[in-house]
């Protein structure tokens, strides 16, 4: 499974919510603002232009451009570092402000059922779309998941 598959399987509505949650301040803090502006082909990057560009960005994800998906994921994840830190702390995963140390194997911290457990614990505290994306991103990145986690309705 590729990163673009996570976006596509979560659906366009979830993608729209994720785009609305991107923090311009965090993009600037982590020096991603100019890179994102260029990758998204936007002359001006702000919440409104990002929202308006979402249908076009969704179409680009459908082309399975994994570099593009990686850049989008990075923008989304840095916008939700408080959530990431809370989830990693809950799972007991060692991290530095939400980031893993280089060459660290954290897969042994992800026990059976961790996705449902994290969803139930944090879904009321954080935006559901961002939490669902992070759960799937973590599973893909660390556990090499081949399927997308979707909580029971």
Give names to the regions the model predicted.
Residues 1, 149-153:
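Short intrinsically disordered terminal tails
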Residues 1-34:
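Short terminal alpha-helical segments
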């Amino acid at each position: 499974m590729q990163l673009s598959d996570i976006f596509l399987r979560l659906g366009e509505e979830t993608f729209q919510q994720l785009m609305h949650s991107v923090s311009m301040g965090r993009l600037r803090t982590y020096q991603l603002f100019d890179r994102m502006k260029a990758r998204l082909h936007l002359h001006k990057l702000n919440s409104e232009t990002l929202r308006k560009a979402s249908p076009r960005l969704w179409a680009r994800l459908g082309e399975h451009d994994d570099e593009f998906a990686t850049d989008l994921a990075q923008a989304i994840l840095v916008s939700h570092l408080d959530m990431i830190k809370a989830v990693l702390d809950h799972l007991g995963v060692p991290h530095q402000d939400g980031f893993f140390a280089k060459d660290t194997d954290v897969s042994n911290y992800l026990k059976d059922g961790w996705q449902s457990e994290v969803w139930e614990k944090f879904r009321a505290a954080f935006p559901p779309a961002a939490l669902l994306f992070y759960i799937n991103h973590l599973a893909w990145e660390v556990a090499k998941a081949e399927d997308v986690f979707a909580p029971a309705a």
